[in-house]
Every structure is written in structure tokens, then in C-alpha cells.
């Protein structure tokens, strides 16, 4: 199983604000684009992917919305608005949740009040962790074994203190090339490399 974690530091956990933030400073469209490229292929979808979207602009707790591709039955269309609607619905269902609770939104989609750090600690038990870094090992030279998990961010870079805690969890820095790419572009390149070599 391949996993992708998108840490959306500026994405609001209020559904209305989320939908209003498309194309604005928070760039919530990044969530939909990354989800689209992680799960879908031409005329189908991948059945071996889980995507965790961690929304951190909140009054209480971060929200982690997880999409398990093999369990999703209907996303309502292959377009930005349909995917953002699914995310907004998960946020609406998460209202009133206390720390580290989980709710099922619909088949293949869950929402949890869990932080990025806590999520990654859990994932480190079953996945090989990778974080994007221009100075990391070129992805074409990296060995992948078992279940790889790729840690991405929105337009706000990962804080330095997060890099240190990720290193302690065994995360490896990998590079997709000399340019800084959007998370959704990283997903496409990662999938392509794994499709060829795994």
C-alpha cells in the first residue's frame, strides 16, 4: 500500500472557509489536486493508495481526513469541486469531536482529530517514511521496500523542527529534481517511478 500525507498548514477546518479559500491565500485547491493525482488514473482509480490530508488552520484540533482508494465507492465526479465537497463534508461531520477521535464519513473516507506529528508516528510503525528535499537522494537511486509513505506540504514549507522529529522516526529525504514542485506534481512523479520499478 502506498501512502501520501499532505500537511496543509493553511487549510481551514471550517468547511465554508475551506470552500471559500480556493484560489485565495490558503490555496485549498491543492488538497483536491493532490487527492486527484494520488487516487485516479485514466478511466479508473488506483486500489493500493491511502491519502491523508492534514488540515491545520483550526480553532481547536487539526483534522486528518483519510481516503482509502480500495474502499471508496463514489466521489461524485473527477473534478476539483466534487473532491472539495467530500473534504467539506468530512469537516462538517468532525464538528464537536474531541482530541484524537475518529468518525467514518462514508465508505473509504474517515476524519480524525489527530495532529500531523501523531499521524506520522502511527504510520512509522507500518510504512517506510520519505520526505521531499531538493538535497535528498534522487528518487531513481532510492530503494523502496514494503509500504512507502510520502510526506508532502502545501505552499508553506515543513518547519525545521518537524524535519528533526521525522528524522528520529527514520524518514529518508528524497529528491524529485532541482525544482520545487506542487504536492500534486510530486504525487504524479512518485507514482510513475514506483509503477516502473516496484
Swiss-Prot record:
Binding site for S-adenosyl-L-methionine: 132, 186
Gene3D superfamilies: 3.40.1280.10
Location(s) in or outside the cell: Cytoplasm
InterPro entries per record: Alpha/beta_knot_MTases, TrmY, tRNA_m1G_MTases_N
GO biological process terms held by the UniProt record: tRNA methylation
EC number: 2.1.1.-
GO cellular component: cytoplasm
HAMAP family xref list: tRNA_methyltr_TrmY
PANTHER family on file: TRNA (PSEUDOURIDINE(54)-N(1))-METHYLTRANSFERASE (PTHR40703:SF1)
Similarity comment: Belongs to the methyltransferase superfamily. TrmY family.
Name of the protein this chain belongs to: Putative pseudouridine methyltransferase
Organism: Photobacterium profundum (strain SS9)
Amino acid at each position: 500500500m502506498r501512502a501520501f500525507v499532505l500537511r496543509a498548514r493553511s487549510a481551514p477546518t471550517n468547511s465554508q472557509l475551506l470552500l471559500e479559500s480556493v484560489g485565495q491565500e490558503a490555496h485549498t485547491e491543492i488538497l483536491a489536486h493532490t487527492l486527484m493525482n494520488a487516487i485516479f488514473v485514466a478511466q479508473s482509480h488506483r486500489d493500493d493508495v491511502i491519502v491523508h490530508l492534514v488540515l491545520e488552520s483550526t480553532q481547536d484540533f487539526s483534522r486528518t481526513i483519510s481516503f482509502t482508494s480500495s474502499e471508496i465507492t463514489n466521489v461524485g465526479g473527477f473534478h476539483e469541486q466534487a473532491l472539495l465537497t467530500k473534504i467539506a463534508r468530512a469537516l462538517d461531520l468532525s464538528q464537536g469531536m474531541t482530541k484524537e477521535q475518529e468518525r467514518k464519513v462514508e465508505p473509504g473516507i474517515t476524519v480524525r482529530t489527530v495532529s500531523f506529528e501523531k499521524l506520522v508516528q502511527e504510520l512509522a510503525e507500518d510504512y517506510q517514511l520519505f520526505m521531499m528535499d531538493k538535497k535528498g537522494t534522487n528518487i531513481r537511486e532510492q530503494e523502496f521496500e514494503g509500504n512507502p509513505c510520502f510526506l508532502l506540504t502545501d505552499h508553506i514549507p515543513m518547519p525545521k523542527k518537524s524535519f528533526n522529529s521525522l528524522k528520529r522516526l527514520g524518514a529518508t529525504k528524497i529528491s524529485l529534481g532541482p525544482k520545487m514542485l506542487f504536492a500534486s506534481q510530486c504525487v504524479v512523479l512518485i507514482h510513475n517511478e514506483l509503477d516502473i520499478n516496484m
